[in-house]
Amino acid sequence: MNDTIAAVSTASGPGAIGIIRMSGPGALSISSSFLFSKNGFLSPSDIQPRIAIQCVFQIGDRKIDQILFFYFKTPNSYTGEDLCEFHFHGNPILLREALDAIFRAGARPAKQGEFSRRAFLNGKLDLTGVEAIGRLISARSRFELELAQKNVFGEVSRLTSNLRSQLISLKAECEAEIDFSTEDLTYESLEERKVRIEGVKTFCQTVIAKSNSAEKVIQQLRIVLYGEPNTGKSSLMNVLLGKDRSIISEIPGTTRDYISEEILLEGIPVRLVDTAGVRETEDHIERLGIERSEKEFQSADIRLFLIDVSKKEEWKKFIAKAKGRLEGSILVANKIDIRDSSWNPNLFSDVKDLIICEISCKTKEGIPILLDEIQKKAATMGHVEDYVLLEERQRYHFETIVRCLDKTLRLIEEGAPAEIYIQEMNYALSEIGEVNGRVDTEEVLGRIFSKFCIGK
């Protein structure tokens, strides 16, 4: 890394500010050849680290723009090298002209993710930190963003540090028993050792499970609208989306397959699913749609169970059949504006964890309350404190650690000497190192940094 790289680090297109970033041993000297103040061009000795300098970016005799310039001296910079930033007005033509001049002065174009690669290679970031930055940039929801922020500030590094500490303690106990076997010392029993190893394994499995749950939320929770025909599922779908997506008709069986759309609720991505109305039918196509409705209902993260409270016999008959399936759902009593006098929400007081919302899709009565209840349910599934976000590569290494610990336990059960099962602990420790980026090949680095933009 003896060369100097440069790139635009702000988004393409016009903007209030456009930033060119340059890193490497020649960054300061190249920069000074373009920085013009009232006393002439600045020399490197005129430029103090971490102090904003207002000056003119000038190419030869031609003034290009009034800019702010920042210099970060090695090693106290993002990349660990001398790093300079030019803050221009954000015109793409202007930035291109300035960047071309910087290239002519001796810098070369940065490759994808090269600034972060240099930060990693110079020890400014471990690999989990680099991956966290990539996730931070690409996050599609507030939930994903907050999980990425946790990792930027060292969540995965803390977990691996904790795990490493537990494993080293275990390994040290085993090695002490080997090295001082002739001494009159007391060591933990094999049963106690197995309990400790199981504890470390459980720690890993918990991290993996929390990550899998986080990915499920990131990939979208599914909110399924379920009920008999003409209870208002399609109308509610359109109301929640704020647009006409589902066809509405008085004819039963209009929706024959599920329809889905993505929305954001409190920063959490969810997918609304409008299903076919559930009823007895001889129509083969409609029956297939009803079967899909059942599958969607079973796999839903949040269930909206719709009933039409304007028709006494209809909703009472349906609830008699379906009351046992309401636990944990939101019962949406639709058409409350024309409800039958027999409607009584207290009929469901014995159903566990059931929320009842009375609404009218026609008048919009109760819709804000329903939305609030949906958001509350979604939020309970999206508390960032309850989750860990592992990248696919990191998850693989955690799963490998679990396999190493499983083999360690099996070897102990089989009566293998400590010298043998300690080797599995060494493999597990090696996997922890891989999580944080103690890697020997360029392949992993290339795969990670290929997802970054040029100026990062």
Swiss-Prot record:
<dbReference type="InterPro" id="IPR004520">
    <property type="entry name" value="GTPase_MnmE"/>
</dbReference>
<dbReference type="GO" id="GO:0002098">
    <property type="term" value="P:tRNA wobble uridine modification"/>
</dbReference>
<keyword id="KW-0479">Metal-binding</keyword>
<dbReference type="InterPro" id="IPR005225">
    <property type="entry name" value="Small_GTP-bd"/>
</dbReference>
<feature type="binding site">
    <location>
        <position position="21"/>
    </location>
    <ligand>
        <name>(6S)-5-formyl-5,6,7,8-tetrahydrofolate</name>
    </ligand>
</feature>
<feature type="binding site">
    <location>
        <position position="456"/>
    </location>
    <ligand>
        <name>(6S)-5-formyl-5,6,7,8-tetrahydrofolate</name>
    </ligand>
</feature>
<dbReference type="InterPro" id="IPR027368">
    <property type="entry name" value="MnmE_dom2"/>
</dbReference>
<feature type="binding site">
    <location>
        <position position="254"/>
    </location>
    <ligand>
        <name>K(+)</name>
    </ligand>
</feature>
<dbReference type="InterPro" id="IPR027266">
    <property type="entry name" value="TrmE/GcvT_dom1"/>
</dbReference>
<keyword id="KW-0630">Potassium</keyword>
<feature type="domain" description="TrmE-type G">
    <location>
        <begin position="220"/>
        <end position="379"/>
    </location>
</feature>
<dbReference type="GO" id="GO:0030488">
    <property type="term" value="P:tRNA methylation"/>
</dbReference>
<keyword id="KW-0547">Nucleotide-binding</keyword>
<keyword id="KW-0819">tRNA processing</keyword>
<keyword id="KW-0378">Hydrolase</keyword>
<dbReference type="Pfam" id="PF10396">
    <property type="entry name" value="TrmE_N"/>
</dbReference>
<dbReference type="InterPro" id="IPR018948">
    <property type="entry name" value="GTP-bd_TrmE_N"/>
</dbReference>
<protein>
    <recommendedName>
        <fullName>tRNA modification GTPase MnmE</fullName>
        <ecNumber>3.6.-.-</ecNumber>
    </recommendedName>
</protein>
<feature type="binding site">
    <location>
        <position position="255"/>
    </location>
    <ligand>
        <name>Mg(2+)</name>
    </ligand>
</feature>
<feature type="binding site">
    <location>
        <position position="251"/>
    </location>
    <ligand>
        <name>K(+)</name>
    </ligand>
</feature>
<dbReference type="InterPro" id="IPR027417">
    <property type="entry name" value="P-loop_NTPase"/>
</dbReference>
<feature type="binding site">
    <location>
        <position position="124"/>
    </location>
    <ligand>
        <name>(6S)-5-formyl-5,6,7,8-tetrahydrofolate</name>
    </ligand>
</feature>
<keyword id="KW-0460">Magnesium</keyword>
<feature type="binding site">
    <location>
        <begin position="249"/>
        <end position="255"/>
    </location>
    <ligand>
        <name>GTP</name>
    </ligand>
</feature>
<dbReference type="GO" id="GO:0005829">
    <property type="term" value="C:cytosol"/>
</dbReference>
<keyword id="KW-0342">GTP-binding</keyword>
<keyword id="KW-0963">Cytoplasm</keyword>
<dbReference type="InterPro" id="IPR006073">
    <property type="entry name" value="GTP-bd"/>
</dbReference>
<feature type="binding site">
    <location>
        <begin position="274"/>
        <end position="277"/>
    </location>
    <ligand>
        <name>GTP</name>
    </ligand>
</feature>
<feature type="binding site">
    <location>
        <position position="85"/>
    </location>
    <ligand>
        <name>(6S)-5-formyl-5,6,7,8-tetrahydrofolate</name>
    </ligand>
</feature>
<feature type="binding site">
    <location>
        <position position="230"/>
    </location>
    <ligand>
        <name>K(+)</name>
    </ligand>
</feature>
<comment type="function">
    <text>Exhibits a very high intrinsic GTPase hydrolysis rate. Involved in the addition of a carboxymethylaminomethyl (cmnm) group at the wobble position (U34) of certain tRNAs, forming tRNA-cmnm(5)s(2)U34.</text>
</comment>
<dbReference type="Pfam" id="PF12631">
    <property type="entry name" value="MnmE_helical"/>
</dbReference>
<feature type="binding site">
    <location>
        <position position="234"/>
    </location>
    <ligand>
        <name>Mg(2+)</name>
    </ligand>
</feature>
<dbReference type="InterPro" id="IPR025867">
    <property type="entry name" value="MnmE_helical"/>
</dbReference>
<comment type="subunit">
    <text>Homodimer. Heterotetramer of two MnmE and two MnmG subunits.</text>
</comment>
<dbReference type="Pfam" id="PF01926">
    <property type="entry name" value="MMR_HSR1"/>
</dbReference>
<dbReference type="GO" id="GO:0005525">
    <property type="term" value="F:GTP binding"/>
</dbReference>
<dbReference type="GO" id="GO:0046872">
    <property type="term" value="F:metal ion binding"/>
</dbReference>
<dbReference type="GO" id="GO:0003924">
    <property type="term" value="F:GTPase activity"/>
</dbReference>
<dbReference type="InterPro" id="IPR031168">
    <property type="entry name" value="G_TrmE"/>
</dbReference>
<feature type="binding site">
    <location>
        <begin position="230"/>
        <end position="235"/>
    </location>
    <ligand>
        <name>GTP</name>
    </ligand>
</feature>
